[in-house]
């Protein structure tokens, strides 16, 4: 996968730049800017990159001082990669959901819940599987070697490698009127989780896009609304749920698919975010949330103590 690598490279470069120019007080801002540059340069979605970098460190907490530096780095990176020949993925939907229909409104609610649960399934299963695999086979080389043989056989048996790689083949099929099977999303999810759990290093973001898009096609057909619009909604919302981010999936949906279905996109992404239960594929993000919650509690306790002192002094 490229996303994880790109973000990590951007983060390391920005961190080292901050140290070199001796600005430790801006270390977190430099980190956000570097991550935004990595994401923005890869996907050429600078707005999504900015909010992804800000949200992925600590969900529910935004460091607004990092907004302008992150925007500068993300747009510069996206422009540079474009000049160097990297093509941005975009899809013309050409269809718009009619929000005056009750059926469409109810379908959006179902989609938001569905995509949220699937994103949660991905992140939760990944963390659980990593622990189980690590406990079952302690030696990482034996674990990777033994399970990889089994995995390779399965990948070959199921449509000759259809579920290997990043999943761009499923994304293309979803938006180019290709063949999407009803079980594509679950097999892609299972194989991706197993591959990462045994110790292979790879990306999660693009596979999440493919899982969401293929699930969206299935859901759209079952609900009787535009499958391609549902694929676009799933593309963004499953990613948002699995990464425990809200603004980033909304922005990536707008930048990749346009603004025709902006309201359905926002509604579905909000519902998916609410359904994920705080679960994330990035465990460091979860620790940051706990730390921030602890800080908030500490502040509240200090505030209560000060009030008690003031009351005692008045008495």
Role assignments for model-derived ranges:
Residues 2-315:
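Alpha-helical transmembrane segments and immediately membrane-proximal extracytoplasmic
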């Amino acid at each position: 996968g490229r996303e994880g690598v790109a973000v990590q490279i951007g983060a390391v470069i920005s961190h080292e730049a901050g140290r070199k120019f001796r600005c430790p007080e801006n270390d977190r801002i430099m980190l956000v800017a570097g991550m935004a540059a990595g994401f923005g340069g890869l996907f050429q979605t600078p707005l999504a990159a900015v909010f992804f970098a800000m949200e992925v460190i600590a969900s529910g907490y935004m460091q607004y001082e990092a907004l302008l530096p992150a925007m500068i780095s993300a747009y510069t990176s996206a422009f540079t990669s474009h000049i160097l020949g990297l093509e941005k993925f975009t899809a013309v939907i050409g269809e718009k959901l009619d929000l005056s229909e009750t059926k469409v409104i109810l379908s959006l609610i179902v989609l938001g819940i569905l995509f949220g649960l699937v994103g949660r399934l991905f992140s939760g299963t990944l963390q659980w599987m990593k622990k189980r695999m690590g406990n079952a086979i302690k030696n990482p080389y034996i674990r990777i070697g033994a399970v990889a043989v089994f995995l390779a056989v399965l990948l070959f048996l199921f449509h000759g490698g259809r579920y290997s790689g990043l999943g761009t083949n499923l994304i293309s099929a979803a938006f180019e009127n290709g063949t999407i099977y009803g079980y594509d999303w679950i097999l892609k999810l299972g194989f991706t989780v197993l591959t990462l759990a045994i110790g292979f290093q790879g990306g999660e973001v693009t596979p999440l896009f493919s899982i969401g898009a293929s699930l969206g096609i299935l859901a759209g057909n079952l609900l009787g609304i535009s499958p391609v619009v549902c694929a676009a909604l799933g593309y963004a919302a499953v990613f948002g749920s699995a990464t425990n981010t809200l603004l980033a999936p909304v922005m990536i949906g707008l930048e990749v698919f346009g603004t025709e279905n902006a309201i359905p996109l926002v509604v579905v992404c909000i519902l998916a975010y609410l359904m994920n239960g705080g679960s994330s594929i990035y465990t460091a993000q979860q620790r940051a949330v706990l730390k921030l919650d602890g800080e908030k509690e500490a502040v509240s306790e200090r505030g209560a103590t000060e009030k008690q002192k003031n009351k005692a002094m008045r008495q």
